[in-house]
Amino acid sequence: MKTDSMEAVHLDYENEEAVKQAQQIGASAWLALASGEANQLNATNALSHLTDLQVRDFALGVIGTATPNIQALISAFIDYSISDKNPDIDAPLHALRAYAYLCEGNTDKADLELKACFSLNSDYSLARLFERTLTAGWETDFYPKMAQELHPKVSDKIFG
């Protein structure tokens, strides 16, 4: 689903119950996509909930801990979804795509995705983090390790 026809979800963080429910919807959609359930509802929920940092970080964990075949499926989904017309959704997608490339060890393509992200949101924090780690010369095997360490914590926060 192209993001130019989609509204990003903006949560009222004072309503903890609504936030948790929205996070569970977004995270569940990423799990469904990773298990091969690519349909309109899952695509919409996965994309529109990326404005929430917990859902975005959950998506990082799904990508970072996925098998290569699932990573390819998610990468194709992200490629298809980016429209560069909705920065609230597309900036996180570019950052997720950069992360997928970093997990593969492809720093050149990751750098291109980070530049695309910055063209939409020059202060996007996750992209800045990846940019700093690339500039510092961190080994790319760090990224999947990061996902393996952080994903259970993010999952517990969303679903616990």
Task: Describe the role of every protein-language-model region.
Residues M1-G160:
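Charged, compositionally biased boundary regions
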